[in-house]
């Protein structure tokens, strides 16, 4: 249903514009090409220049314009440019057409056959030309050949050329899908990653077209040149996986400790060395086919339109079949081998003739084809990489999906689910930490009956809501975008040495797990939830930024019950203060109150939850008496026990995790921009900003910088005056200060600053026990 909706949306919003854009090239060719023998050269040149412009547009749109202007203004700019092109075309149409240039071949004197007829430019001229030719043929003796068909290749050859035209579009777009998936295994997968691959492919196609324009000037047989191009492209494709493995050290993540620009240059260099040879050579095939069309051409526009149509249909089918069938069924390397095989078969089918040169060319194609089929084994190439620092990690099972590669790995820390080699969705070794993402909001709001989880991952967090300790929970709905993640979780997380880590998520009648885009589900459903719990999302990954936008927060707010709350988990070890402040500012803009809660107190690995509250909400009161448990937890302890403290966790002591009221301290975030669908600041700025720090001083908002931010918030709005805590006792309101002191003690302890650690410990004990 989701796919059908997307196809419908694309068809209605993009098809009309793309249909009209498809007319440009044939019409321009009809205007510019006045000589039959110049058709291949000029049309290839036009195609190359047009594609070079596309590469420039992709670079600007992929790297700069959305951040500078926003999507809407970028679209307006594109419309203005299109109108400018239309105006220029209209002005050109007012000028007289250039005079027809006759064929460059030396004409036979006074013979009708030797003259190359002028190329018609209008429908009336074409019809007149056809009537004249028909009249000439009727007057010509039967044994005299026609001027148009005398040098034409046989019909079978024409069909092979059209098939190669189709394959050119099919192969290049299918390969672009494969190349993108290939690099998703070793790159951070931000919007810039995909823009880089697209720009490199477009530049190579443009250069290939310009090379083709030069080849069209040669006197060599076009079919022989085509065969050699296809053969060279297939050879480059065969080498691509091995070059990729060499440059990425067997698929390890490509990273740089330098600046943003140095990292982008590293990506461009790695991607160009890997795919540019294949893309450049294969990019010459389609424009060079225009050279072979010269013998058949009656009208430049008609021929260009025919070739472009066949090539584009192939491109559409290549992207669709590769994305939805080949990757799922064959995987990256086998799919690349099949596409290489198709190119080699096409080269063998081209009608070269039976002279020695042609036979040698065919023999070489056959040898390369056999080597590709039998000597090279794609199964020997790795599909994902493991953590080089965890040498004991081993891969248990892999699923190659259309949009990512999902793997289950096992190591000393437990069983993990990963996406694209390096992005971990969770592990049995982090069971308690993941479960806390459900426990914490349910301890704050113990009367919760219904929850929605945006993201499933291992299933531990969503399943945590079904724990018997949360006796009021009646409904849990969880959405996961990647179906293979659900498969992995069902298979490996429900029976971990006999223990169901998901808490019965896949068989409890209260739970529903959907393979669906969580954001789209919240926009479309009419269901209401007491808690909408959004998982951790890496902010710089492509698509993740949309889960931090104002529009998403607004649609989530609409799905809350009158007393419901929205919970957004944030990995501070992947956020700079800039990104955190943008997200905080955006949530403050949507929700009446926004509070911040710690997930843990481990310096360097901090996670927080931002909870969006609706108007008039306060935290519910708690009548649990935890006094004895609190005293027992610290009895006889000192700063050396910081890492071993077992503090009680219940609805009373949960305020220990409270970081403060962000709405009351909104002055700290007012200078930061909003993150919106139109201006996706997080998605485009996060990959840049975190590379501004040096290698020995990470820019993440963890440790002391985060503790300092909490101190600022609690200074502006002390817990004793916090409107969200009015239902809590005076002593209980001191718990947030105890949490801040405890976190500070952990930070100073890691620095081995004994005096500062002791001071923070003393402050923690005072606030924890509510004694002065």
Predicted features along the sequence, with ranges:
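Alpha-helical transmembrane segments of multi-pass membrane proteins
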Residues: 1-617, 622, 626, 735, ...
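Short, solvent-exposed mixed-charge patches
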Residues: 515, 771-772
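SAM/dcSAM-binding transferase cores
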Residues: 618-750
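Alpha-helical solenoid scaffolds that mediate protein-protein interactions
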Residues: 763-767, 771
């Amino acid at each position: 249903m989701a796919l059908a909706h997307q196809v419908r949306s694309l068809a209605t919003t993009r098809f009309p514009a793309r249909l009209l854009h498809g007319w440009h090239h044939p019409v321009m060719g009809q205007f510019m090409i006045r000589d039959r023998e110049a058709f291949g050269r000029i049309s290839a040149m036009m195609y190359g220049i047009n594609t070079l412009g596309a590469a420039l547009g992709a670079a600007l749109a992929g790297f700069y314009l959305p951040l500078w202007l926003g999507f809407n203004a970028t679209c307006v700019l594109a419309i203005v440019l299109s109108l400018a092109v239309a105006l220029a075309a209209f002005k050109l149409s007012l000028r007289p057409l250039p005079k027809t240039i006759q064929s460059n071949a030396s004409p036979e004197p006074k013979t009708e056959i030797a003259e190359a007829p002028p190329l018609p430019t209008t429908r009336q001229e074409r019809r007149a030309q056809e009537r004249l030719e028909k009249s000439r043929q009727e007057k010509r003796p039967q044994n005299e050949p026609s001027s148009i068909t005398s040098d034409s290749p046989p019909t079978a050859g024409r069909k092979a050329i059209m098939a190669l035209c189709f394959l050119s579009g099919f192969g290049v777009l299918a390969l672009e899908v494969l190349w993108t998936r290939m690099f998703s295994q070793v790159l951070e997968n931000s919007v810039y990653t995909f823009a880089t691959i697209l720009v490199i492919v477009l530049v190579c196609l443009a250069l290939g077209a310009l090379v083709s324009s030069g080849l069209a000037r040669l006197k060599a047989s076009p079919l022989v040149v085509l065969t050699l191009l296809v053969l060279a492209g297939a050879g480059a494709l065969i080498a691509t996986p091995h070059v990729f493995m060499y440059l990425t050290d067997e698929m390890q993540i490509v990273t740089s400790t330098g600046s943003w620009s140095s990292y982008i240059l590293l990506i461009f260099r790695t991607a160009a060395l890997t795919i540019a040879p294949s893309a450049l050579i294969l990019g010459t095939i389609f424009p060079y086919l225009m050279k072979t069309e010269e013998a058949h051409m009656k009208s430049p526009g008609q021929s260009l339109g025919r070739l472009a149509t066949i090539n584009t249909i192939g491109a559409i089918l290549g992207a669709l079949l590769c994305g939805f069938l080949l990757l799922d069924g064959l995987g990256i390397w086998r799919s690349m081998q099949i596409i290489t095989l198709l190119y080699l078969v096409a080269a063998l089918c081209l009608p070269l003739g039976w002279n020695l040169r042609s036979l040698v060319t065919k023999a070489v194609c056959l040898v390369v084809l056999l080597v590709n089929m039998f000597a090279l084994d794609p199964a020997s190439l790795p599909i994902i990489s493991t953590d080089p620092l965890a040498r004991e990690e081993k891969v248990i099972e892999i699923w190659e999906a259309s949009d990512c590669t999902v793997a289950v790995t096992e190591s000393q820390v437990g069983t993990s689910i990963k996406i694209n080699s390096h992005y971990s969705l969770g592990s049995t070794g982090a069971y308690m930490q993941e479960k806390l993402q459900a426990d914490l909001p349910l301890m704050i709001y113990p009367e919760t009956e219904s929850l929605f989880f945006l993201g499933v991952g291992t299933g531990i967090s969503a399943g945590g809501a079904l724990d018997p300790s949360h006796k009021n929970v009646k409904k849990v709905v969880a959405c996961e975008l990647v179906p293979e993640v659900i498969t992995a979780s069902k298979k490996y997380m429900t029976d971990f040495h006999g223990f169901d880590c998901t808490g019965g998520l896949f068989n409890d009648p209260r739970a529903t797990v959907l393979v669906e885009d969580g954001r789209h589900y919240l926009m479309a459903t009419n269901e209401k939830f007491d808690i909408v719990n959004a998982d951790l999302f890496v902010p710089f990954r492509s698509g993740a930024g949309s889960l931090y936008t104002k529009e998403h927060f607004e649609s989530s707010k609409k799905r809350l019950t009158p007393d419901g709350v929205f919970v957004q988990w944030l990995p501070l070890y992947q956020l700079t203060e800039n990104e955190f402040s943008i997200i905080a500012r955006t949530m403050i803009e949507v929700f009446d109150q926004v509070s911040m809660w710690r997930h843990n107190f481990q310096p360097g690995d901090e996670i927080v939850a931002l909870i969006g509250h609706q108007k008039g909400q306060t935290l519910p009161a708690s009548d649990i008496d935890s006094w004895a448990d609190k005293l027992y937890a610290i009895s006889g302890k000192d700063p050396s026990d910081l890492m071993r403290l077992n503090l009680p966790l219940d609805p009373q002591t949960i305020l220990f995790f409270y970081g403060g009221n962000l709405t009351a301290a909104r002055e700290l975030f007012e200078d930061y921009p909003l993150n919106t669908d139109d201006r996706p600041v997080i998605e485009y700025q996060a990959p840049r900003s975190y590379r501004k720090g040096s290698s020995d001083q990470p820019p993440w908002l963890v440790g002391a910088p985060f503790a300092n931010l909490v101190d600022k918030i609690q200074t502006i709005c002390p817990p004793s005056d916090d409107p969200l805590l009015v239902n809590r006792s005076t002593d209980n309101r001191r718990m947030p200060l105890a949490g801040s002191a405890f976190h500070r003690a952990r930070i100073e302890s890691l620095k081995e600053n004994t005096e500062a650690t002791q001071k923070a410990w003393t402050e923690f004990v005072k606030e924890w026990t509510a004694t002065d």
